[in-house]
Regions:
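Terminal, low-structured helical/coil segments at or just beyond the last alpha-helical repeat
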Residues: 141, 147, 151-179
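Amphipathic alpha-helical repeat scaffolds of TPR domains
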Residues: 5-15, 31-52, 78-93, 118-128, ...
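Short coil/turn connectors between adjacent alpha-helices in alpha-solenoid helical repeat scaffolds
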Residues: 49-61, 93-102, 131-139, 176-179
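TPR/TPR-like (Sel1-like) alpha-helical repeat modules
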Residues: 1-3, 104-105, 129, 136-152
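Structural signature of alpha-solenoid helical repeat scaffolds
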Residues: 30, 35, 57, 76-77, ...
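Alpha-helical adaptor scaffolds
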Residues: 77-113
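Conserved structural position within tetratricopeptide repeats
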Residues: 5, 73-74, 108-112, 147
Length: 179
């Protein structure tokens, strides 16, 4: 809810014409770059919450999630190490009826936007490779992350250490994940 309570957003919202849902979507689609962090974390947290819900919940929120993340891509595509691309990689692997290659395309964009951020590769393995039942690529990608030095890029070090541990956990679960 942080972005919805932001003064800058509320000013934009109040100047928009239409019913409440249309106003929110319109205001989000025109949000300025200053709102990128608030929008990113709001929608990212919303997705992680929705991932534990039935697929219909993700479908019901699809328009909102896509509008916000496409706005972020238009303003700051590399925000949080290609986070909007990574978001779509995860999201499109979890929406029924969406071609799984859309997930792959977005994960590849996330990785190319910041190859040093391990989360892009680990989430690609966890969501895309698992969904597409590509165990060899899953194993290779996770092992590559484990073999990297997480301390080289100090600004990413805490998250890279986390994702190395996540990669190890996923490798330990491979038999369950690929039954």
């Amino acid at each position: 809810k942080s972005v919805l309570n932001n003064e800058l957003f509320l000013t934009l919202l109040n100047s928009t014409i239409g019913d409440s849902s249309f106003k929110v979507l319109s205001a989000l689609s025109e949000a300025p770059i200053e709102l990128v962090p608030a929008m990113y974390w709001w929608v990212t947290n919303k997705l992680w919450h929705l991932n534990s819900k039935p697929a219909i919940e993700r479908i019901n929120h699809r328009e909102l999630l896509e509008i916000v993340m496409h706005r972020i891509i238009s303003l700051d595509p590399n925000y949080h190490y290609g986070g909007a691309y990574r978001f779509f990689g995860v999201f499109y692997s979890r929406i029924p009826g969406v071609e799984i290659n859309q997930s792959k395309t977005y994960f590849e964009k996330a990785i190319s936007s910041n190859e040093n951020y391990f989360g892009n590769k680990v989430q690609m393995a966890e969501f895309f490779y698992q969904k597409s039942e590509n165990k060899p690529s899953f194993l290779i990608q996770l092992q590559q992350v484990i073999n990297l030095d997480a301390s080289i890029h100090t600004e990413m070090m805490p998250e890279n250490i986390y994702y190395q541990k996540r990669a190890k956990n996923l490798l330990n679960q491979q038999d369950t994940l690929f039954e």
